[in-house]
């Protein structure tokens, strides 16, 4: 494969091998070298999404990668986003806009159509930037998904880009993963692979050298880097809920998040996970909600079915008891809708048409509608006995919520948002990302009962995480082998 500076694709032997983080780090490394770079992922399947300035929806990981590249995220960085809404179906978002719900078989046939906008978006980025760092999805060796592939080698062949393959040694079997993945590719695809990266290594590299030599001899491909395990790295997870927490302080606020079946944008809770004064606990199916200070009902892609799920777990009764004992409850997006009096879906947007009774803690009613509300926004937050503080975030929801606006705790640039209820013990808002601002996070935690809040700077933590990854790549990867034309920039 002829190396080029115009694009490089990162594929992985498995999901969660480290593709997203590697792309993030490479974007920051290139920016440091004065190279104008953009991230790209042709197809992403995730319920964690971000909103672009022009009101489009993309995968959250691509928004973080854009931050690493020091540019504003656009819909062209993730032209196809699949948001699962059932076990066999998903909402299809193309270049930022939802176009349809499809089951897996229906979408498989539709892939030939979406390759058009995928290549259009990729071309737009190539025209604007010196290079594009592309992230694959899952593994390129999934035999059942190879037909009409738009996410891995199908895209790489169409766009004619070189590929590196990353594997996670912490899972075990790294040589089988890399050798087997390469062996399952076609000859032309194998020729496209320029090398391997081994991720999350712990221990003495000398103990690995014989295996590296064997892999290079058997495949004819170089190992371009062995990356160490980065303990405590605080970057958003693409899909799986990250439960890793920082070391706790003496004074703590206990926060519980019930995990819904279609929970979305759980990255909302990353600032709480990183907060030294917060003990954050995710409660799953079959688990009771323990005694706590604050319960936060998260967003969900399927509000009515997840409301039914919440009741099936008995969480509604446990929330009721929690409030009787003086605790606080917060709902974000779909969680906010659940806290109201009713949720109607007359057009069957999320499944069977009908109406569900809400939990009844807020004087609101929600009607689900085909048109999604997608926007970045800023405003102020004022909770009881708390000062008014600036807030920013984004909205992603299909519902229109109506009700009393006189006690809306959030005042946005285009109007009021949210509501307070039950003696100011319940707070609902549509605003995702609300905990990312230090002052807003302080206000919410103080309202929930934490005294002397000491909220860390989440934006700074994310920047430090990105820089830490980039520092690691500069130390442990043979970056000059990826871009020979820029080799002088990577001289050590």
Curated annotation (Swiss-Prot):
Annotated metabolic or biological route of this protein: Cofactor biosynthesis; adenosylcobalamin biosynthesis
Residue ranges of coiled coil: none
Location of the active site: 333 (nucleophile), 432
SUPFAM superfamilies cross-referenced by the UniProt entry: Class I glutamine amidotransferase-like, P-loop containing nucleoside triphosphate hydrolases
InterPro entries named among the record's database cross-references: Class_I_gatase-like, CobQ/CobB/MinD/ParA_Nub-bd_dom, CobQ_GATase1, CobQ_N, CobQ_synth, GATase_3, P-loop_NTPase
Key words, A-Z: Cobalamin biosynthesis, Glutamine amidotransferase
Source organism, top-level taxon: Bacteria
One term of GO molecular function: catalytic activity
Residue ranges occupied by any GATase cobBQ-type domain in the UniProt entry: 252-440
Pfam family, one: CbiA
Any one biological process term the GO annotation gives: cobalamin biosynthetic process
Function recorded in the entry: Catalyzes amidations at positions B, D, E, and G on adenosylcobyrinic A,C-diamide. NH(2) groups are provided by glutamine, and one molecule of ATP is hydrogenolyzed for each amidation.
Family: Belongs to the CobB/CobQ family. CobQ subfamily.
Name assigned to this protein: Cobyric acid synthase
Name of the encoding gene: cobQ
